[in-house]
């Protein structure tokens, strides 16, 4: 059966079949190759795309702006202080206005329900650049990188170490289930995802020969891993008491060379960034002053090692 994703929003990986995800990965690969070869064809000339951000960003904003411009479209950025979105104007009203001016909307914010409503009311495709619940565009980029280094996805052991409730971890879990990988979450039980989402992922995994598991032992999780992934343990804006309890819970799940040594010799290390792997950031220094740890979710040794592909 022919595959046609024209006009479809990209809100979460649960909405897409393995075949559709495969198509998006292949398209991403082809566009990347064409750009490097200097023969990219601009298929979006005359189109207009708006980036609607409730949260500031470096990589997400730059990636969408560059990709949109590379494809010949015009782009408008509306940051946290650049619109009345959610303050003086409802999500539905904003969606209807933007849908009449733009051909697509990219959203980065808080509630998943907001990006779902943008898609419901705008009448144009909406792309999720991060919500509290999911970060599907990040996972497309990650899986493309994994394929570039490993040759394929199916059958790989993919470990996420840290707070497995966060949007990247949950999206990776769903993505691994869809694409036939063996996802292992390394975290204390208090920081495992919702049982409902885990069960949904396990049902998907039955169809793709994937597996979904969670363990509270870092060495066990990373044994023979093909990919080890982590993310920050705390976010700015969270109260200090959350920082302390979270750091104490996750200290045993730091990605260090002990974790790398029990993985496969060609294991790759991944991180969605930013990372607190040294004292060269304001947050990193604050954490060191308060908790006495110079490195948080990953050691600088691993971050700068031959296994690290965080900038790819």
Curated annotation (Swiss-Prot):
Q: Which UniProt keywords apply?
A: Arginine metabolism, Cytoplasm, Transferase
Kinase among the record's keywords? no
- Which residues are recorded as binding L-ornithine? 167, 231, 235-236
Q: Out of the domains of life, which is the source?
A: Bacteria
Residues the entry annotates as binding carbamoyl phosphate:
57-60, 84, 108, 135-138, 272-273
Catalytic activity reported: carbamoyl phosphate + L-ornithine = L-citrulline + phosphate + H(+)
Q: What pathway does this protein act in? A: Amino-acid degradation; L-arginine degradation via ADI pathway; carbamoyl phosphate from L-arginine: step 2/2
Record carries keyword Ribosomal protein:
no
The record's GO molecular-function terms, alphabetically, read: amino acid binding; ornithine carbamoyltransferase activity
What the entry lists under SUPFAM superfamilies is as follows: Aspartate/ornithine carbamoyltransferase
The record's Gene3D superfamilies line, in alphabetical order, gives: Aspartate/ornithine carbamoyltransferase
EC main class here is transferase
One Gene Ontology cellular component annotation held by this UniProt entry: cytoplasm
The catalytic activity of this protein is classed by the Enzyme Commission as 2.1.3.3
UniProt record, GO biological process: arginine biosynthetic process via ornithine; arginine catabolic process to ornithine; citrulline biosynthetic process
**Primary site of residence:** cytoplasm
Where does this polypeptide localize?
Cytoplasm
Functional summary from the UniProt entry? Reversibly catalyzes the transfer of the carbamoyl group from carbamoyl phosphate (CP) to the N(epsilon) atom of ornithine (ORN) to produce L-citrulline.
Q: Which family does it belong to?
A: Belongs to the aspartate/ornithine carbamoyltransferase superfamily. OTCase family.
Can you name this protein?
A: Ornithine carbamoyltransferase, catabolic
Whose protein is this, by species? Mycoplasma capricolum subsp. capripneumoniae
Q: Which gene encodes it?
A: arcB
């Amino acid at each position: 059966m022919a595959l046609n994703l024209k006009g479809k929003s990209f809100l979460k990986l649960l909405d897409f079949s393995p075949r559709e995800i495969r198509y998006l990965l292949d398209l991403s690969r082809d566009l990347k190759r064409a750009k490097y070869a200097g023969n990219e064809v601009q298929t979006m000339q005359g189109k207009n795309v708006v980036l609607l951000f409730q949260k500031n960003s470096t990589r997400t904003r730059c990636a969408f702006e560059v990709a949109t411009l590379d494809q010949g479209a015009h782009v408008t950025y509306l940051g946290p202080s650049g619109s009345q979105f959610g303050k003086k104007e409802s999500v539905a009203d904003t969606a209807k206005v933007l849908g009449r001016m733009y051909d697509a909307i990219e959203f980065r914010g808080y509630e998943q329900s907001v990006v779902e409503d943008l898609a419901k009311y705008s009448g144009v495709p909406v792309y999720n650049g991060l919500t509290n619940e999911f970060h599907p565009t990040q996972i497309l980029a990650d899986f493309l990188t994994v394929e570039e280094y490993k040759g394929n996805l199916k059958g790989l052991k993919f470990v996420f170490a840290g707070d497995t409730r966060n949007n990247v971890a949950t999206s990776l879990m769903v993505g691994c289930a869809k694409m036939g990988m063996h996802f292992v979450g390394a975290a204390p039980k208090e920081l495992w995802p919702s049982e409902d989402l885990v069960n949904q992922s396990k049902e998907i995994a039955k169809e793709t020969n994937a597996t979904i598991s969670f363990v509270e032992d870092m060495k066990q999780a990373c044994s023979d891993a093909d990919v080890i992934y982590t993310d920050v343990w705390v976010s700015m804006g969270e109260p200090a008491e959350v920082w302390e309890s979270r750091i104490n819970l996750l200290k045993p799940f730091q990605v260090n060379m002990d974790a790398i040594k029990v993985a496969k010799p060609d294991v790759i290390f991944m991180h969605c960034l930013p990372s607190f792997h040294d004292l060269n950031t304001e947050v990193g220094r604050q954490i060191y002053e308060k908790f006495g740890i110079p490195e948080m979710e990953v050691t600088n040794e691993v971050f700068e090692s031959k296994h690290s592909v965080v900038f790819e």
